[in-house]
Amino acid sequence: MYIQVLGSAAGGGFPQWNCNCVNCKGYRDGTLKATARTQSSIALSDDGVHWILCNASPDIRAQLQAFAPMQPARALRDTGINAIVLLDSQIDHTTGLLSLREGCPHQVWCTDMVHQDLTTGFPLFNMLSHWNGGLQWNRIELEGSFVIDACPNLKFTPFPLRSAAPPYSPHRFDPHPGDNLGLMVEDTRTGGKLFYAPGLGQVDEKLLAMMHGADCLLVDGTLWEDDEMQRRGVGTRTGREMGHLAQNGPGGMLEVLDGFPRQRKVLIHINNTNPILDEDSPERAEVLRRGVEVAFDGMSIAL
């Protein structure tokens, strides 16, 4: 299985266009050793030719331009994207669909709840129906696994994660299973398994068991501290309120990942306020000391 990190930042990217926190300002001033990042999305393939896009970020055009296999140039109009899987209906994971309209129809896999949001509060399915067949919905059931024809050797097993629906959603304050998913993806030829959960608010025993069965853990790296947005003066909500488990402290993501010495461990969906973006910071050093990697745009993983 080939895993390509197209975007590794949280919503807004890094640096965020309207932010002057210490990280964003430091990057622009050249006083911070850091790498710019686009909003999170990955692509998966079982052959390096046919790709499945997991989430479609607002930065999708630049992300596709940066990854040559996404333009195989076999015809006048071509793409390496053969299907799209949406893990939720958040703005920063779905807006990129608008930029893919020239390539419609697209096979889009998502849950009932995500499809409901994307036909009501943010009706992308309705809007794009006017472009050559638009988005063709394939339902993700919350039980069992599914296979996408373009990559027949990849088996997708979804699992619901506790998180709120987007602010625009008609059921914003009425959460349902299927609002937010993680994925276990297995290459049935190599046996390699990816645990992918860019929005992970809490880890229970069931999730721990799944993580132990994976070879690579690509997980939520949004915040270093739960109250980071408050500390940086750019927000009022905590990580837990937003559905993100912070890395630092008792019960934090790093402590969770300490329990997986065998697995490759990678943080993704990193917020612009997170000090691990500063490559010279003690927080970045602590992450690396504990055997955890920080995802970057263009990162490639093979399982």
Curated annotation (Swiss-Prot):
Pfam families: Lactamase_B_2 (PF12706). One of its GO terms (biological process) is pyrroloquinoline quinone biosynthetic process. It comes from the Bacteria. InterPro entries: Metallo-B-lactamas, PQQ_synth_PqqB, RibonucZ/Hydroxyglut_hydro. Pathway: Cofactor biosynthesis; pyrroloquinoline quinone biosynthesis. Keywords: PQQ biosynthesis, Transport. Belongs to the PqqB family. May be involved in the transport of PQQ or its precursor to the periplasm. This is Coenzyme PQQ synthesis protein B. It comes from Pseudomonas putida (strain ATCC 700007 / DSM 6899 / JCM 31910 / BCRC 17059 / LMG 24140 / F1). The gene is pqqB.
